[in-house]
Amino acid sequence: MVYIDEHIMDFDLDAALQQVSEQRREQALRFKFERGQRTCVLAYLLLKKALREEYGITANPVFEYGEHGKPALVGHPEIHFNLSHCREAVACAVSTRPIGIDVESVGRYDDGVARYTMNDRELRLIAGAQRPDVAFIRLWTMKEARLKLTGEGITDDLKAALDDAGRWQFTTVEQLARNYIYTVCEERG
């Protein structure tokens, strides 16, 4: 299940900080800028909402971290989640199977970044698209959601991140009127 919130600047941050775990509060307050604090808190609140609505869990979630830094829920190894944020939105995905999500703002297309992160087939798709900026972000969110699902994070070879794409199921949602795209990745089967 996916939860999205676009109201990053529309809540009382001080009050929200009292609704999160001490672990998350400390993490949020390490951000230098308020927007970072807000997205950190809002992502956690979305996770709390998802856990309550999907699994009946009302306690504040506490995280433990895997080998590559991917968070997992303490006491609930059967529940998988992933969080992401961009300037326009915060996203949370929860499942009983490993899951990854990435949300990104649609910005100015940069051919240099594309050449560094995309393989030849992906570059052709972008070049042939009516909106290269959208095509690039669509592919980027797929790569990042896949890498977040496996816990790898951004790797040295981003060009190969989708080489095994047949193994994964991607769901991409384009909210172009709101200037963002998100992709959810789950393993097929």
Protein language model regions, located:
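Core catalytic alpha/beta fold that binds nucleotide/phospho-ligands
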Residues: 1-189
